[in-house]
Amino acid sequence: MRLLWKLVILLPLINSSAGDGLLSRPIFTQEPHDVIFPLDLSKSEVILNCAANGYPSPHYRWKQNGTDIDFTMSYHYRLDGGSLAINSPHTDQDIGMYQCLATNLLGTILSRKAKLQFAYIEDFETKTRSTVSVREGQGVVLLCGPPPHFGDLSYAWTFNDNPLYVQEDNRRFVSQETGNLYIAKVEPSDVGNYTCFITNKEAQRSVQGPPTPLVQRTDGVMGEYEPKIEVRFPETIQAAKDSSVKLECFALGNPVPDISWRRLDGSPLPGKVKYSKSQAILEIPNFQQEDEGFYECIASNLRGRNLAKGQLIFYAPPEWEQKIQNTHLSIYDNLLWECKASGKPNPWYTWLKNGERLNPEERIQIENGTLIITMLNVSDSGVYQCAAENKYQIIYANAELRVLASAPDFSKSPVKKKSFVQVGGDIVIGCKPNAFPRAAISWKRGTETLRQSKRIFLLEDGSLKIYNITRSDAGSYTCIATNQFGTAKNTGSLIVKERTVITVPPSKMDVTVGESIVLPCQVSHDPSIEVVFVWFFNGDVIDLKKGVAHFERIGGESVGDLMIRNIQLHHSGKYLCTVQTTLESLSAVADIIVRGPPGPPEDVQVEDISSTTSQLSWRAGPDNNSPIQIFTIQTRTPFSVGWQAVATVPEILNGKTYNATVVGLSPWVEYEFRVVAGNSIGIGEPSEPSELLRTKASVPVVAPVNIHGGGGSRSELVITWESIPEELQNGEGFGYIIMFRPVGSTTWSKEKVSSVESSRFVYRNESIIPLSPFEVKVGVYNNEGEGSLSTVTIVYSGEDEPQLAPRGTSLQSFSASEMEVSWNAIAWNRNTGRVLGYEVLYWTDDSKESMIGKIRVSGNVTTKNITGLKANTIYFASVRAYNTAGTGPSSPPVNVTTKKSPPSQPPANIAWKLTNSKLCLNWEHVKTMENESEVLGYKILYRQNRQSKTHILETNNTSAELLVPFEEDYLIEIRTVSDGGDGSSSEEIRIPKMSSLSSRGIQFLEPSTHFLSIVIVIFHCFAIQPLI
């Protein structure tokens, strides 16, 4: 009997465990929703969706109004997967509440309930409607009277034969609750036939009623009267959470009433409310608890007002706050599940197991959302649902309860085969077999049963913990697990290793930026254990691959030293060497302090600024681990090249000084300031520049220099100077003061020049005698006052142009392109005008005025060569004197004809003979053209190949003899000499040095690109030597 009881308990467990990794309860992925189906489409099919996941795959059932649907009895229903398909649905048979059930081996779950309804609208009755008679100014209601229907309707009205709907405004309103047309005040244009038009979107159908005639009575006009509210919203409206609530209110009256809204509790209407149709409709979207309360509509005109009010009551379907979760428990354990939902009104709870209602009994306690099952057995396994329900909706939370019963089993969680530990360490050997109910645990070392002692503890979860390990603790350890269904054993080995010790830890270091250091980290360890070194900097692992520019691990198997190259300020901090083995992790830490030049000072402020000084303050930046010893202030202006150090008070700014006065500034100049700090390591980066500020204006102190002048016209005194640069003008309104007086006079004349860029002043007075000496000084001024004056300089007044023309002018032609002009010097005095030099003018018969040549010579020069002339051309020339005032009268013109052009043909058929150091040359006589000058002789030009100096030999013959030392090659050319100048040269002839000369006969050169035929013949004794 006991064996049979065990089998009953174990059989479900075996089946469940066989696929424990795969089995899963049904979980809905699709649930049915309410459907309103068009009645006119009854010959088609309606689908109620349902789908669920689970393993094995769930199968499905459906309930209609709580009764199972029999799919085998009728073609009317069929399953499409888990969804219910109803063929040709019928309003009498199929209307109602539907629910889907999904089932597999683990249990059954119920879906939400879905309502199936049928939308329709019948036709209006065809009988004629009665005529409605009203006076002008009276209000009227035209009834729509919708036919039988189901589903939401929308209403509109047409007028006479107009296809467009009646437009609604503050005088006309169509209620979407009743369908009636309300006209607040009838006008003559309202007379006609009105037709109600109804659309049922869910039924996909529209119907049109019979026309209602509206006529105007002839017994007078309706007088004014107070509003009469015809469209009212209900006194109580149930409004769902998150829904959109619409309240209608419309009144008849003369004049046409205005509509307004308010809350009776005095609170303002929510900002989200929307008004439409001249405020006849108030819409509250996304309705919430705070929106409920009493609302009032006020219709008013000049004759009075009327009110309509109603209460909006908030309700909310249930929503889960706490759901139940899948739970696996051992046999005989207790289950406690709690679910909780919100809603208004508060929901009540029911519990289901595998789709059936669960009722309280001896082991089962149900109280609101709490389910307690004591002393679980395998039959309690299944899928449970907590249902939360109020009068508006029911919702379900699903979970699986799996009750397990089995003997101890180590197959999924065996004792670790090998456990390693170091001498002196602690170890926990786990023992966690699968056993339901939980197994009792005991341990053996070898064959010895272990009992708890000072070093050996049996933990609550069955694990074995041993403290302060010694070598003798090594061996095999067996865990024995027992419950009422059986016993199981599992064994593992404990291996004891020597401890790892850091023998050389890193130590604190103090270094300077740019140095390289080594942080030691060396260990002793069990030879069989692999050691891994990991370095941390300020808590972060140092990536030695990415940090290759600075960090490098050096050393062997037991050495993990860290080298830091070119150390920087940001390398200051804590360095942690971690030694990791499979058994333990050791670490040692050291602080590295990196010292460097200070960081940039901060918050540089200009406290005050005058014309030449500025008060500065600043805060010290980081000292980078070395105290700041000195500060330096630098300035920059638009006129300076970069930043310049400036003088300060105090003169030396030590590391504790944070304000100073900058002196020696220029007035009215824009300055930027910055501060630089220094310490024993070096000078740091400068601070950010201060704001750009201008010093105050001041009287200028720098006087102009390089005072000169003179020249100009008669009766003028011209004074020049070097202008003062902007940075020395010291303020706005800058200009120059010009002071002058004749030499010997005691009275100064004073003039002002307001242009800051001026460097010249001309004073004109007819009484000024030419070339009179004046004492001159130039000063400066600005809006602040007059500044310094220069030293006195003598400047002469302007002079007259020369009054006399040169005499004895003559012309002589030297060549085809050159002539010489000569004249007699003028003896001048103050009355005839000073002569500084002479100007030669020359031209041809056909020269235009713009083509007249001009050449000046200074001093007492009385001849001038003019070159670049045309050959065989008549040239005219005249000469005139000049001075600073201008030029005087010209001499009478003279003329001369330039020589004919020199010969254009170069000497030809040049032959040469070299004997020792004597070179004999001969050539043909050059015949000239008719327009060329006759040949008067020849020039031989010769030079050594590697020298630039050329020697010239002139001859009247067509041959020449040269005595030259031929230690180098010589280059020779020959040209004609004539009255017109030198003619064209022959091509260069290369005469080799004696040591390289050999007899080679005669060589003829091809004609040149200038069509010059040259034949070079080399004679040596009686043989002919060819050209090299």
From Swiss-Prot:
Tissue specificity here reads: Expressed in nervous system. Highly expressed in cerebellum. Expressed at intermediate level in thalamus, subthalamic nucleus. Weakly expressed in corpus callosum, caudate nucleus and spinal cord.
Q: Where is this region: Disordered?
A: 887-908
GO CC annotations, alphabetized = axon; parallel fiber to Purkinje cell synapse; plasma membrane; presynaptic membrane; side of membrane; synapse
- Covalent lipidation (GPI-anchor amidated serine) residues? 999
- Predominant cellular place of this UniProt entry's protein: membrane
Polar residues compositional bias: what residue ranges? 887-902
What this chain does, per the record?
Answer: Contactins mediate cell surface interactions during nervous system development. Participates in oligodendrocytes generation by acting as a ligand of NOTCH1. Its association with NOTCH1 promotes NOTCH1 activation through the released notch intracellular domain (NICD) and subsequent translocation to the nucleus. Involved in motor coordination.
The protein depicted here goes by the name Contactin-6
Tell me which species this is from.
Homo sapiens (Human)
